[in-house]
A protein has these predicted regions:
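Short beta-strand-centered interaction patches in the first periplasmic/extracellular domains
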Residues: 86, 91-95, 130-196
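Amphipathic, non-transmembrane alpha-helical segments in extracytoplasmic/periplasmic proteins
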Residues: 39-40, 103-127, 142-165, 283
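Sec-dependent N-terminal signal peptides of Gram-negative outer-membrane/periplasmic proteins
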Residues: 46, 78, 84, 99-102, ...
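An acidic/polar, Gly/Ser/Thr-rich interaction patch typically located in mid-to-C-terminal regions
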Residues: 21, 25-50, 194-324
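Short, compositionally biased
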Residues: 74-82, 176-178, 299-311
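Ser/Thr/Pro/Gly-biased, low-complexity, turn-/loop-rich segments
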Residues: 57-60, 66-68, 73, 98-108, ...
Length: 324
């Protein structure tokens, strides 16, 4: 089957206008808080192409007989180059307004209300996983801090990720392969025969064995700590201390647990390149079949997916973390 693509610009299909000029189309889907991105490289022969305005919405689809949407992106950069004469259009899923610094306080709010309010400010829909929706935030300051950074900080404290994707602000579990509704993502199976290239890198296990977080005890008016152990019970364990002082013991412990999950993640990295598959998305669980059993016979979560379409065909490159 021959791979195909389509691109719409502010809702208008421009595929036929650029098909004979397309040199490459790249979509990078990121797990976690990084913004998903899109890059379109076109031949600028004749220099008569109409260029997109800053903030133009592009929707990209890839596939074969049936095309799959890989998201919507706002253009934020156009680059000209010679030789050869080319135009590179870059776009991202995160709105520029997300970078604007703000100062405000969030008091006696549940996370669902915070996410909903920020999403509305940026004309986004929102989806939040049920396990986070009703968590109460007694007090949290946003001081000269962008909404992107603030939500990242809030999400990290609760073992979640928060990012705009496809016009929706997400607040979902980190690396658990679930949608915002709590539904498990389908396990992606990749056979070694599908791979055109792959690599596996083992990294030294993190040095920290204990996480300490601080909080204000209202009853005594003093600063106290909570501890979360990772792999050791030794008194000589290396300690990671979280700088933030939390308003409650529960929030401090939640943040310590989330920090522990992050420190233990990604101790083995796997990268696999296969023939293009538009059904593969970041955060999905992966099962590798027929690869070297040690250390690749384990559970994986996709950290990033790069879809690339050009004259040579359509490939999908995935980068995975071990999720055990």
């Amino acid at each position: 089957m021959k791979p195909q693509f389509s691109i719409t610009s502010n809702g208008s299909d421009i595929t036929s206008q650029i098909a004979d000029r397309l040199l490459s189309l790249t979509v990078r889907d990121e797990a976690g808080t990084k913004s998903d991105t899109c890059s379109v490289v076109l031949s600028d022969k004749g220099q008569n192409l109409q260029l997109p305005n800053d903030g133009t919405e592009l929707e990209v689809k890839l596939g074969y007989e049936t095309l799959v949407s890989l998201g919507k992106y706002k253009t934020d950069e156009v680059r000209f180059a010679f030789p050869p004469a080319t135009i590179t259009i870059r776009a991202k899923a995160m709105p520029d307004t997300f970078k604007t610094q703000k100062t405000r306080s969030w008091d006696d709010k549940i996370i669902a209300d915070i996410v909903s309010e920020i999403a509305a400010e940026h004309n986004l829909n929102h989806r939040i996983a049920s396990e986070f929706a009703t968590i109460e935030i007694e007090h949290m300051d946003q001081t000269e801090e962008s909404d992107a950074h603030f939500l990242t900080r809030l999400a990290k404290e609760h073992g979640a990720i928060s990012k705009p994707a496809g016009g929706t602000l997400l607040f979902i579990p980190t690396g658990e392969g679930k949608t915002a509704s709590g539904k498990a993502l389908s396990v992606i199976e990749i056979n070694v025969d599908e791979a055109t290239a792959y690599s596996c890198t083992q990294k030294q296990r993190g040095k920290y064995e204990k996480i300490i977080a601080k909080y204000n005890d209202k009853e005594t008016g003093t600063e106290k700590t909570v501890e979360h152990m990772l792999n050791s019970t030794s008194e000589d364990s290396a300690v990671k201390r979280i700088k933030t002082i939390f308003p409650t013991e529960a929030e401090a412990l939640e943040a310590a647990k989330a920090e522990g999950i992050e420190l233990q993640a990604g101790q083995i990295d796997v990268n696999v390149t296969i023939v293009g598959r538009p059904d593969i998305f970041a955060e999905s669980p992966v099962k590798l079949i027929g690869f070297r059993s040690d250390p690749m016979d384990t559970n994986w979560t996709i950290r990033s997916v790069t879809h690339q379409f050009n004259s040579g065909g359509y490939t999908t490159k995935i980068a995975c973390d071990n999720s055990d």
